[in-house]
């Protein structure tokens, strides 16, 4: 009997650290792989895996937050990370997988270190222009780190593959689910979609609630992350979370206002959507979204607006600039070669694993 192929995934803390895993896992399952996931049972990764219904065995470990600054909590978290490494060693030694694939986040560090100690090949994916602290640690233990952006040639274990996204690869017909929304929208107005992400939605939610000029001048779609805001009324659709409707809503939008998370902005690039990036600042993040926004603006894919400057007047100006120069932005996006299909990346990953 042929030896069963096994792979372990890890990554979590935010939806962005799980999305690529959820794209890849069905492909491994389809090809007969046994799939395991190491994460935190209280984290978004467990919620997303559970919600997906995929045939994945989930293993929960202790996890501690990694901080760049002094905190007494660091002392406790050192023990949590150490315990997480021991748990991961026991889990991975029992599974004996062909590889571990990590999408980053604090929870990924123990499984990455454990895999290296057990001589299991470690493949890591980095979405942002600069590495987060977890992936800086993971790089030291990685066999290969795949990157969305070009990295310094001194990082010899990196391999630039571009952004991996399934959004934009297929087109959707108008769904019946959209009919009720369209009935409330004015076809003479531009439709603006606000996407806040799992960590940055509140500012957009509050802004929409406090800015009546928005629904007087635009049709507004707000993916809010907050079910208490769900509503469908004249010129306004607010929903906490979407799956099948995600791309149809993107298709529906003329303009998108988004945070600077790598997954979302590359989805918008794939769909060639006019978009304004309002990145999380350094007070709320490590500055990765600022770097991503600068890169997209420099390449001519998008405009950006800093959060402290967000007002009805500034937003209106930025959206008008996108519309006025729409052809220039769309031409730049059309010329980009920064998108990799999930199938191509899956084949590359499987080949890399097979060659080890």
From Swiss-Prot:
Transmembrane segments: none
EC primary class: transferase
Binding site for UDP-N-acetyl-alpha-D-glucosamine: 198, 289
Substrates-to-products reaction catalysed: Mur2Ac(oyl-L-Ala-gamma-D-Glu-L-Lys-D-Ala-D-Ala)-di-trans,octa-cis-undecaprenyl diphosphate + UDP-N-acetyl-alpha-D-glucosamine = beta-D-GlcNAc-(1->4)-Mur2Ac(oyl-L-Ala-gamma-D-Glu-L-Lys-D-Ala-D-Ala)-di-trans,octa-cis-undecaprenyl diphosphate + UDP + H(+)
InterPro entries reported in the protein's UniProt record: GlcNAc_MurG (IPR006009), Glyco_trans_28_C (IPR007235), GlycoTrans_28_N (IPR004276)
Pathway(s) per entry: Cell wall biogenesis; peptidoglycan biosynthesis
GO cellular component, one term: plasma membrane
GO-annotated molecular function: undecaprenyldiphospho-muramoylpentapeptide beta-N-acetylglucosaminyltransferase activity
Membrane topology classification: Peripheral membrane protein
One GO-annotated biological process of the protein: cell wall organization
Alphabetical list of Gene3D superfamilies matching this protein: Glycogen Phosphorylase B
Subcellular location: Cell membrane
Keywords, comma-separated and alphabetical: Cell cycle, Cell division, Cell membrane, Cell shape, Cell wall biogenesis/degradation, Glycosyltransferase, Membrane, Peptidoglycan synthesis, Transferase
Protein EC: 2.4.1.227
Family: Belongs to the glycosyltransferase 28 family. MurG subfamily.
The protein's role, per its UniProt record: Cell wall formation. Catalyzes the transfer of a GlcNAc subunit on undecaprenyl-pyrophosphoryl-MurNAc-pentapeptide (lipid intermediate I) to form undecaprenyl-pyrophosphoryl-MurNAc-(pentapeptide)GlcNAc (lipid intermediate II).
Name this protein carries in UniProt: UDP-N-acetylglucosamine--N-acetylmuramyl-(pentapeptide) pyrophosphoryl-undecaprenol N-acetylglucosamine transferase
Source organism of this protein record: Streptococcus thermophilus (strain ATCC BAA-250 / LMG 18311)
Gene: murG
């Amino acid at each position: 009997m042929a030896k069963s192929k096994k792979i372990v995934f890890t990554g979590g803390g935010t939806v962005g650290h799980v999305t690529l895993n959820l794209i890849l896992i069905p492909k491994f399952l389809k090809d007969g792989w046994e799939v395991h996931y190491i994460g935190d049972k209280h984290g978004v990764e467990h919620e997303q895996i559970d919600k997906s219904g995929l045939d994945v065995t989930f293993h929960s470990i202790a996890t501690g937050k990694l901080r760049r600054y002094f905190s007494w909590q660091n002392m406790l978290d050192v023990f949590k990370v150490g315990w997480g490494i021991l748990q991961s060693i026991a889990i991975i030694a029992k599974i004996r997988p062909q590889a571990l694939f990590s999408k980053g986040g604090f929870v990924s560090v123990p499984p990455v270190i454990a895999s290296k100690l057990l001589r299991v090949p470690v493949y890591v994916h980095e979405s942002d222009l600069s590495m987060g602290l977890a992936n800086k640690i993971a790089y030291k233990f990685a066999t290969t780190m795949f990157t969305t952006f070009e990295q310094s040639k001194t990082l010899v274990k990196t391999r630039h593959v571009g952004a991996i996204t399934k959004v934009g690869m297929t087109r959707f017909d108008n769904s019946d689910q959209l009919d009720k929304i369209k009935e409330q929208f004015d076809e003479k107005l531009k439709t603006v979609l606000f996407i806040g992400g799992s960590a940055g939605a509140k500012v957009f939610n509050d802004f929409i609630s406090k800015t009546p000029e928005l629904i007087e001048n635009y049709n507004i779609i707000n993916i809010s992350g907050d079910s208490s805001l769900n509503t469908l009324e004249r010129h306004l659709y607010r929903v906490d979370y979407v799956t099948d409707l995600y791309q149809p809503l993107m298709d529906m939008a003329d303009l998108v206002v988004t945070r600077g998370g790598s997954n979302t902005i590359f989805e918008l690039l794939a769909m060639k959507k006019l978009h304004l990036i309002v990145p999380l600042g350094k007070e709320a993040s490590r500055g990765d979204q600022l770097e991503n926004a600068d890169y997209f603006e420099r390449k001519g894919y998008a405009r950006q607006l800093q959060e402290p400057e967000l007002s009805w007047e500034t937003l209106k100006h930025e959206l008008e600039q996108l519309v006025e120069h729409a052809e220039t932005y769309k031409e730049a996006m059309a010329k980009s070669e920064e998108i990799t299909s999930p199938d191509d990346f899956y084949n590359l990953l499987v080949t890399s694993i097979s060659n080890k």
